[in-house]
Amino acid sequence: MKIILFLVFISALAYGFVREQGISIPALSQWSRGSDSALQAALENKQSDVQVQGEGVVSRLLPDDNEGSRHQRFIIRLVTGQTLLIAHNIDLAPRVTDLDGGDTVEFYGEYEWNPKGGVIHWTHHDPNNRHVGGWLKHRGNTYQ
């Protein structure tokens, strides 16, 4: 019995460490959050204006979009292999700092379908309280 309790304790510590470091273990990530079914359905049905939550690995950093509201942009790859553009409004939310290729980013925002896979935006609070607030999580920090 002591061995089982010890193993449970060690597993919990390891899980906490993995999450804190932003390390993604695909099977563990899917198990811990479910299947991201709203995002999968939106991708498959080419839907837009869908509030979604998920996680991906940064595959490419892009230059900021400075026309109109400024957006930090990067591409993430989901565990399914699908890629998405993240467009994070840095006029309304802090820039995601120390972001590198290979980093894991969790997101909650609005999905817009496009032929390249789609865009996640509204990853920030709405100062007018007319839209659901979103966020990005990276290396233990939340950006909203």
Go through the PLM ranges and name each one.
Residues 2-144:
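OB-fold and OB-like single-stranded nucleic-acid-recognition modules
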